[in-house]
């Protein structure tokens, strides 16, 4: 489906990542999954999921998140 991997380097030199993906579920819904963290750690800092009844709604949310993260310095 749709996915994007964003990253940024903080002032302290930490590399942060933020992955956003749209996934079709078995129930004809769409889930936007966000995985984020610091590359220095073995596992991610967090995972968040949002479920939408249509692809269009999921796409709008996906683009909104992407725009917000890019404003915060992720590329």
Regions found by a protein language model. Give the residues of each.
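Helix-centric, low-specificity signal for extended rod-like, repetitive segments
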Residues: 1, 9, 27, 59-62
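Boundary/linker segments flanking structured domains
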Residues: 72-75
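N-terminal first-folded block
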Residues: 7, 19-20
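Short aromatic-glycine-(Arg/Gly/Cys) micro-motifs in beta-strand/loop hairpins
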Residues: 20-48, 63
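A short, charged, amphipathic alpha-helix used as a generic interaction element across diverse proteins
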Residues: 41-44, 53-70
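Short acidic/glycine-enriched loop/turn segments that link adjacent beta-strands
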Residues: 13-14, 28
């Amino acid at each position: 489906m749709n996915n994007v991997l964003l990253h940024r380097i903080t002032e302290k030199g930490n590399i942060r990542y933020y992955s956003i993906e749209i996934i079709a579920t078995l129930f004809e819904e769409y889930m936007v999954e966000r995985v984020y963290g610091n590359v220095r750690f073995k596992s991610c800092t967090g995972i968040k999921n949002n479920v939408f009844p249509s692809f269009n709604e999921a796409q709008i949310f996906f683009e909104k998140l992407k725009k917000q993260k890019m404003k915060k310095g992720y590329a």
